[in-house]
Amino acid sequence: MPDNEVHALFIGWAEARISDRRANAVFRRMAARSGIDRRWSVLAPPPHGTQVVGGFYDGAMPSTAARMAVYAEEAPRLALRAIGQLGPLGRISHIVVASCTGFVAPGIDQIIARALGLPGDVERTLVGFMGCYAAVAALRVAHHIVRSGPDARVLVVMVELTTLHLQGDTEIEPLLGMLQFGDGAGAAIVSAERAGLAMDRFFAATLPDSHDLIRWTIADEGFVMALSGEVPGRIADALADSATRATIVGPGPVDAWAVHAGGRSVLDAVERGLELPATALADSRAVLATCGNMSSATLMFVLARMMAGKRVDNGVAVAFGPGLAAEGFGFRSAA
């Protein structure tokens, strides 16, 4: 994660923008119930920040080009920090990078490879603009690479700078949407070695008539998130459907759930739709509390907590994003 904690600062910034007293009270109440205690940003608060107050833009909103300039500098830096936590990388044959919060060319995959001193014949894949379930797509690509060539060692990286896309809204709904998001990066090595978590049974399920419920649009002043209030209810209904549930749950009893921490209401919907006990999503709720929603990087944080915990015999990882779709995979402790 970055060094700048911004959750409380954002709440103060947002409250100052809501002129209606009743709406302001609703915002404060919803913020208190969000399940989020801390979020982090690459944007530094004063006195180190320049165009920002409390870690966020002040006054005129910067152009998309200005935000992409920050992304080009900060995203590789945060990704390399996450990679550094893996320890010695050893031989790397492939690199797969997922990010939906910025664009730069040469790509962030090339920037990371060059910074790590990887040889020029390392094969690269960039998963872009998929949203919160991009971690699943990146891990799926790595999984198939290793299945095709068991000697492969794939470096997988997710890096998201969601706070770059703060908008100048004064209405409560978009401000509550922005309340959830923070910056973060996660990394892993996918190989045929018997260590960590073993992945299998990748799946996808797109909900019918839901394509407008989550939108991520490139605008003149950053990327704009539109998140319908219908999303949690539609997720709960879909998970209660026997066919969708069978796709996600798979053949056996599940002893661990790694659910993308997309917000308290989303986690509540998953818990309700799958009829899970209150403790089943404890790791996801812990990540939400300490980091917020970091888009594709979030699931990596949940999986890291599970790797540090008890043995998993039949786990399911799942994330939700534009479509509206669920993507995920089965996993178990490898050793």
Residue spans of the language-model regions?
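Claisen-condensing/thiolase-fold acyl-transfer catalytic domains that form or cleave C-C bonds
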Residues: 100-101, 119-121, 126-147, 236, ...
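Active-site-adjacent elements of ketosynthase-type condensing enzymes
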Residues: 104-110, 156-176, 203-219, 264-272, ...
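Active-site glycine-rich loop that binds ribose-phosphate moieties when present
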Residues: 120-121, 127, 134-141, 158-184
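Condensing-enzyme catalytic core mediating Claisen C-C bond formation in acyl metabolism
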Residues: 1-70, 168-237, 241, 245, ...
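Conserved beta-ketoacyl condensing-enzyme motif
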Residues: 36-118, 129, 252-267
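A contiguous, well-structured pocket-lining segment that forms one wall/lid of small-molecule binding clefts
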Residues: 66, 70, 81-84, 215-288
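Short, well-ordered amphipathic alpha-helical segments that serve as non-catalytic structural scaffolds
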Residues: 35-36, 74-87, 141, 185, ...
